[in-house]
Amino acid sequence: MQRNTILHKTLARALSMKRPHNSEGTRRLTDWLALNAPAHAKMHRDEVGNLHIDARQSEANRTLFVAHVDTVHRDEGPNKISKTTTHWRADGAPLGADDGAGCAMLMHLLHAGVPAYYLFTQGEECGGIGAKYVSDDTAFLLQFDRAIAFDRRGIDSVITHQGYGRTASDAFAEALSEALNADDTLWYLPDDTGVYTDTAEFIDVIPECTNISVGYYNEHSDQESLDIVHFTALAERVARIDWDSLPTLRDPSVKENKWDAYDDWYLGGGREATSVTSFARGHWLVDDRSEEHTSELQSQSTISYAVFCLKKK
């Protein structure tokens, strides 16, 4: 990755700071993002500190890109980064690629001239504080057909479900996967094993809400790393996608439980079930290894971090 690009500058800036919610780190990064946005973009901050950057060129531009500026760090200060030609890591702390990598990807898309609306949210790690605030504005969300986050571990997921519910159609995820894989350097597939990111807050209004693997592993732990080779290849690809040409099929008024398709398959004697496709397609070969490695660390920290977030609100 070239050092003087906005992609590299944003990533290095974000990862160099510990950024717990409502901290000096989140304020400094948000200020930096605003200062380094393209001059022509319309920009404002809302009441909870989310940074909105509108780079749409017409009403036909109906894509919302989302990344969050906060991390799971509990203290503030510098974050010492170790770099190799293939991976970045932090010394004794989470790297913060969740979601510093997403912030860098959005800035890259902005400067590449991709016409869309860009939203940098506050407090995702504390329950989606910024996204929940935005979700109350139905008129705003009705402007979009798709909400895209770059906040998923691994290197191959286009998320169709978060928690137990569907957030994006299979047709959308398949089309986006094909677009990401177009030059044969990436290998993305629809994945129904998503957990949570900001786009989950928009599913009652926006039809296609997804999360794309951005190359980090072992998030929320001091073993977190970022596959910089994959991250760079992804950045090169996403700037060439025609996002507004992607299909829009999911009906936000129809709530689909993750296991509905499996029940149909089981009761119907073997009809196709989208809920088991992630296992069949191989995502678990990546995700299980990551989750297994960090599950103990994450389970130990979940309750105490929730208390920390309450204190920071």
Predicted ranges, named:
Residues 44, 59-115:
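Active-site metal-coordination/substrate-binding segment of hydrolases
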Residues 38-46, 80-87, 182-190:
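Short secondary-structure junctions
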Residues 95, 99-170, 191, 199:
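Acidic/histidine-rich catalytic neighborhood of metal-dependent amide-processing enzymes
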Residues 296-313:
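Positively charged, low-complexity/disordered segments
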Residues 146, 160-285:
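Active-site-adjacent substrate-binding region
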Residues 289-292:
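Short, compositionally biased segments
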Residues 7-60:
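A non-catalytic alpha/beta surface segment that caps or lines the substrate-entry region
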